[in-house]
Amino acid sequence: MRIKPYFESDDKNFNIYQGNCIDFMSHFQDNSIDMIFADPPYFLSNDGLTFKNSIIQSVNKGEWDKNDNEASIYNFNHEWIAQARQLLKDNGTIWISGTHHNIFTVGQVLKENNFKILNIITWEKPNPPPNFSCRYFTYSSEWIIWARKHSKIPHYFNYDLMKKLNGDKQQKDIWRLPAVGSWEKTQGKHPTQKPLGLLSRIILSSTQKDDLILDPFSGSGTTGIAGVLLDRNYIGIEQELEFLELSKRRYHEITPVLKNEFKQKIRKQISAI
């Protein structure tokens, strides 16, 4: 039985579903997804404080980001990653972003589920939040693990394009990309929103036109918006109504004129599209 999306574009290339990704992924067809990008909860919401935009703010993102039980976090990651593997095509790949709070558990779970880790990308942010406590080095990066489903089945990688985007030099595993720009938040924002430049580079490097991309933690829909700009097909899963509505607004924002404007801005971030 086909599950009805919360929102489906007229061309059926942009679909978002409301619900828990673990529940929903079991309803999708196995071996049908070309690439998965996932930005799972980092579980950072511990009532601490941070310094952002010259204002002291709470680090709390929402109830979905609260969990201080290591066993529970491990089981959560194991369950959704195992289901994600079922959905990937045999030559498919998965990208998972995180910080030191969750990325080591994610890497371990990937290996336990027989993924082959290809790279660990360091996303360096040129303008990180100030070091509020002054008790350790300033956090200025996040990591993104890239892995493929099978150790011996080749994956797709657009090496030539990545080299072209890097001034005809091999693209390294340290990416210096800016955080989300104000032009990406005109319809609203998500507390852990990723920049379109980051997702565009990921999509361009590991997928081809008309490929099917899944984001099980869709948030504000950045993966899907980047997919629309780059002529890919998208499935997103998100629990929170406010972010589903935000994703819809962002999708409807992309008129032909604005699509070209967005691509020009992304081009400045990653050199060329």
From Swiss-Prot:
Single Gene Ontology MF annotation: DNA binding
Reactions this protein catalyses: a 2'-deoxyadenosine in DNA + S-adenosyl-L-methionine = an N(6)-methyl-2'-deoxyadenosine in DNA + S-adenosyl-L-homocysteine + H(+)
One Pfam family this sequence matches: N6_N4_Mtase
GO-annotated cellular components: cytoplasm
Main EC class the enzyme belongs to: transferase
GO BP of this protein: DNA restriction-modification system; methylation
Keywords annotated in UniProt: DNA-binding, Methyltransferase, Restriction system, S-adenosyl-L-methionine, Transferase
SUPFAM superfamilies with a match to the protein in the record: S-adenosyl-L-methionine-dependent methyltransferases (SSF53335)
EC number assigned by the record: 2.1.1.72
Top-level lineage group: Bacteria
Family statement drawn from the similarity comment of this UniProt entry: Belongs to the N(4)/N(6)-methyltransferase family.
Note: The MboI restriction system has two different methylases.
Function recorded in the entry: This seems to be a weaker methylase than M1.MboI.
Name under which the protein is recorded: Type II methyltransferase M2.MboI
UniProt source species: Moraxella bovis
Species lineage: Bacteria, Pseudomonadati, Pseudomonadota, Gammaproteobacteria, Moraxellales
